[in-house]
């Protein structure tokens, strides 16, 4: 039982570091989400192609708005920043599926 509070305290500390880094990265000040900043390789491009239309349109809007703000060297008002708690990984399920399918194709190609 003595170890339990230490785990809880360390996980709270780690969560605090995550929130600090999230805000320090700065993409949230432009209204972007984490998944909007992923480097686009072939797997990511395919995952983006598979997004439902509403998620895809939201992503395009956030990226265009961020580019516009960046060109004008501005950031959004603080109340419009993407909050750590609200940042959902919308691309991850699609990306995992694409990677799984690619690995499966590679396995079949080996045989």
From Swiss-Prot:
One cellular-component annotation, GO: mitochondrial inner membrane
InterPro entries assigned to the protein according to its UniProt record, in alphabetical order: QCR7, QCR7_sf
Modified residues (N-acetylalanine): 2
A GO BP entry: mitochondrial electron transport, ubiquinol to cytochrome c
Pfam families: UCR_14kD
This protein's UniProt keywords: Acetylation, Electron transport, Membrane, Mitochondrion, Mitochondrion inner membrane, Respiratory chain, Transport
N6-succinyllysine, modified sites: 78, 88
Function: Component of the ubiquinol-cytochrome c oxidoreductase, a multisubunit transmembrane complex that is part of the mitochondrial electron transport chain which drives oxidative phosphorylation.
Similarity comment text for this entry: Belongs to the UQCRB/QCR7 family.
Quaternary structure note: Component of the ubiquinol-cytochrome c oxidoreductase (cytochrome b-c1 complex, complex III, CIII), a multisubunit enzyme composed of 11 subunits. The complex is composed of 3 respiratory subunits cytochrome b, cytochrome c1 and Rieske protein UQCRFS1, 2 core protein subunits UQCRC1/QCR1 and UQCRC2/QCR2, and 6 low-molecular weight protein subunits UQCRH/QCR6, UQCRB/QCR7, UQCRQ/QCR8, UQCR10/QCR9, UQCR11/QCR10 and subunit 9, the cleavage product of Rieske protein UQCRFS1.
Protein name from the UniProt record: Cytochrome b-c1 complex subunit 7
Originating organism: Bos taurus (Bovine)
Species lineage: Eukaryota, Metazoa, Chordata, Craniata, Vertebrata
Gene name of the record: UQCRB
